[in-house]
Amino acid sequence: MHPGTASRALNPELPGRIAEATVLRVRAAADALGYRPDPTARSLRTRRSGFVGVVVPDLTNPVLPPIVRGIEETLWGAGLACLLADTDNDLEREAAVVDELRARRCEGLIVASATRTGPAPEGVPTILVTRDIDGSGLPLVAADDAEGVRAAVAHLREFGHARIAHVTGPLSLSTTSRRRDAFRAAAGGDAPVVHGDAFTIPAGEHACGELLRSGWDGTAIVAGNDLIALGCYAALAAAGLSCPRDVSVTGHNDTPLVDRVQPPLTTVAIPQHEIGVAAARLLLARLAGGPDGPERVLLPTRLVVRGSTGPAS
């Protein structure tokens, strides 16, 4: 048999040009030999790699794995696989990773950037997820953070809290500014805001400690995320204060196990898996050449009330 005939028989786009009996015979022989098409050669021919690059800043962040899972499941169902890269919150590494994924002919990118001020990827369809890049004009899929923060402040108001503070992460992230701006709009522009250098438990403990040492005499804290909230727990305990008897605390994200801490954390739940699904669907629509669709997709949040909030003391 001519090699060209065998090649056409193995090409899923061309078997109709070859007799069915020949196609079956060639494929049976290929299976017996363990033959698999070379994806690199196929991508050079079709100009499609079958891969999408997914860039995240820190896979140890408990918010990100469910988002990545939603992306992966949706893309796999459409015949695409993910190339996952962790940038360790390093902007230079992020730029290098994006260049490498483009060099590998990724058909698109889904990116959670290390910072809001970094350069946006160019030359390949890109969707931003959870974190925006200033001035990029790229589509963003995220939770409706403002809605969630408003719900947290309203919940505390119902308990009689009037002096509410916001302990949050670094201003280098769009997540921080979205939640901070929503807090100020809901709690008042003079409500104190303290920034930690990361969205971590140690950063939350340090920032909350700064708040307490400043002489703040409030009764409630809206934390920028759940890890910051757990850091606030530690700072309050170190200062001899009890949550929620002395100070109520809310978190944001509803990450795993925050219902198991003491007290169980009242928090804003974001649809983590659904964010990944929506980002993948938006990218697939763009790859298919359809309408560009919305530039911002904000998915609804919900307040989960647990034991860390109570009446103002």
Predicted regions and their residues:
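Short histidine/acidic/glycine/proline-rich micro-motifs that form metal-
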Residues: P12-L14, D58, D88-N89, G169-S174
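Short beta-strand segments enriched in small/hydrophobic residues
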Residues: P3-R8, R45-D58, H155, R163-G169
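Short gly/ser/thr-rich secondary-structure transition/capping motifs
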Residues: L33-D38, E92, I110-V111, Y233
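ATP/adenylate-binding site constellation spanning eukaryotic-like Ser/Thr protein kinases
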Residues: V23, S49, V68, G123, ...
